[in-house]
Amino acid sequence: MPARPVIVLVDGNAVVHRAYHAIPPLTSPTGEPTNATFGFVSTLLKVLEDHHPAYAAVAFDIGRTFRHDLYADYKGTRPPLPDDLRVQLERVREVVARLGLPVVSVQNYEADDVLATLARQSVARGLDVIIVTGDTDTLQLLSLIHISEPTRPY
């Protein structure tokens, strides 16, 4: 029986954040911060090389979610996003688009919510799913869906 096609779903925010904190500050010749961008792109390319997916997509958060409306202090203890990380999140979105991968964001939902929906739909369509994230919230999806933590060596 032939292997089922694979879809790789990447939690863009989680992987960028992990790279930002794991890799020492790097800058381009023009002074643009690049450590998170470098880490994200390295992880993405390695995952694509290792798994040869038939499909792939990257999800990003785009602001407040329905959870903020339900609970005013949702993520209230988190510090504001550093400017050098904000710049790199935008750069990563550009890189993903240039690589020809779909960027998926849904107003009022976090990236991991979007990935969970895409994962369940993909399984229902007969695909094997690999979610690339450092967010342990996705562990509740484990079944035929595989979770790939980018800090593990590839």
Predicted region positions:
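Noncatalytic, basic helical substrate-engagement surface that gates or grips nucleic-acid strands
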Residues: P2-V132, T136-L144
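Single conserved hydrophobic/aromatic residue that forms the stacking wall/gate
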Residues: I145-Y154
